């Protein structure tokens, strides 16, 4: 039976600015998105039936649970768009922490667009996949593209950028949950004292200047989360103490990442954070600049 396997890479935000809150309630952003080597894996198999079957980490999801999942919604979107009258079994091996600010759900949905495009030979262009997927989530079009990108508007305007220089990325997710809605509701974009130098970071990326990139790492959402969850600041501080060029919260959190030039320093920092019990979901990764 035909079978396709796809990797779904996590993302981090090297810089994140909120420009303003629009009259419709959405926030206009300007941010640098970057895929990293931490990934989920999805396997796609045709079935004899007509249902979408979703299995996660060897546990079949009940239909009522599966239908709320972005993977299911992405598959349903493709079936509807192309009038496909066939079933598919999607098996997910979940490695990316959930609700972590790393687009774990969005990247899985992006893998569905790529996987089913190949399985059913639909010949969808990247633009077509992005156009369909934006209805499901603002981060999915970026995840379909992957790599390094400047993201503007409400996240739908994407400008591809060259890969940054090689580095080791330490990921640490503290054992807390952060509501994205809470963060944005408590962010006062119009009164922010300082905005990240996203344009300067774009130049540093184009010039292959790792130190220029890390010197400009800022995330305005930290102005909300660090007050509520001091562990985020603690993890950042420990990473810098252990030799990170810089450390930052990704997205709306709570995951923190640090950028290191040497793998042994990243590993040592990981050991220290684990020892201090600041996080038990810790990974040493690298930048990835390939499409799904």
Task: Label each PLM-derived region with a short phrase.
Residues 1-100, 118, 122-127, 154, ...:
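ATP-binding N-lobe of GHMP and related small-molecule kinases
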Residues 2-7, 15-31, 122-246, 259-292:
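ATP-dependent small-molecule kinase catalytic core of the GHMP/sugar-kinase superfamily
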Residues 43, 89-91, 248, 283-286:
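Residues embedded in well-ordered beta-strands within globular domains across many folds
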Residues 50-64, 112, 207-217:
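Short, basic/glycine-rich phosphate-binding loops at helix/coil junctions
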Residues 63, 101, 223-224, 258:
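A generic structural signal for short
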Residues 91-120, 138, 245-260:
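Glycine/serine-rich anion-binding loops at beta->alpha junctions
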């Amino acid at each position: 039976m035909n079978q396709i396997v796809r990797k779904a890479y996590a993302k981090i935000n090297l810089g994140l600015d909120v420009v303003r809150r629009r009259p419709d309630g959405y926030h206009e952003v300007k941010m640098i998105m970057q895929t990293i080597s931490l990934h989920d894996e999805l396997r796609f198999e045709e079935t004899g039936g007509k249902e979408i079957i979703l299995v996660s980490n060897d546990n079949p999801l009940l239909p009522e649970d599966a239908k709320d999942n972005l993977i299911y919604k992405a598959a349903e979107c493709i079936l509807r768009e192309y009038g496909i009258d066939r079933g598919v079994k999607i098996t997910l091996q979940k490695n990316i922490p959930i609700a972590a600010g790393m687009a774990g759900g969005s990247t899985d949905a992006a893998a569905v667009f790529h996987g089913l495009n190949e399985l059913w030979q639909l010949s969808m262009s990247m633009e077509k996949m992005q156009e369909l997927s934006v209805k499901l989530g603002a981060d999915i079009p970026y995840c379909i593209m992957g790599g390094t990108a400047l993201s503007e508007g409400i996240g739908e305007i994407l400008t591809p950028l060259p890969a940054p220089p090689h580095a080791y990325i330490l990921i640490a997710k503290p054992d807390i949950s952060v509501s994205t809605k809470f963060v944005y509701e408590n962010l006062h974009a119009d009164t922010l004292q300082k905005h990240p130098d996203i344009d300067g970071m774009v130049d540093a990326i184009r010039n292959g200047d790792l130190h220029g990139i890390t010197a400009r790492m800022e995330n305005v959402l930290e102005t909300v989360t660090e007050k509520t969850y001091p562990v985020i600041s603690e993890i950042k501080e420990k990473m810098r103490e252990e030799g990170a060029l810089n450390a930052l919260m990704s997205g709306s959190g709570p995951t923190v990442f640090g950028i290191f030039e040497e793998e042994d320093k990243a590993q040592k920092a990981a050991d220290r954070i684990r020892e201090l019990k600041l996080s038990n979901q810790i990974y040493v990764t690298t930048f990835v600049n390939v499409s799904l």
